[in-house]
């Protein structure tokens, strides 16, 4: 399972919380964008957030409505992202795509998810491994 972190949907967290009948006491979260986590199961929501006592570069992925309730009440994690859907692959499909160089792999960086504006995440992730996206060809293969 994978989660896309740079594709905002046209809905805000307020819409999701209202749909789930969760009271909002933390007004600052109403306009938080909801992300498209992937094309599969878009009726399923996920919250990626820091732990209560954050360890360097560790996050929790939770499908819990209770996590959203805590966030809405101002008692939840301060750094979080909410998404609907996920990316999924059949057995062996991801490995095949990796072997065909269809993916560029970068190390996880929690600050990329929580601190970088959504529209800059792709470029910043590529920069973590020394890529300049503007110089990348749209053709893949083996040299």
What would you call each of these model-derived segments?
Residues 1-83, 87-143:
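A short aromatic-anchored loop/beta-hairpin motif
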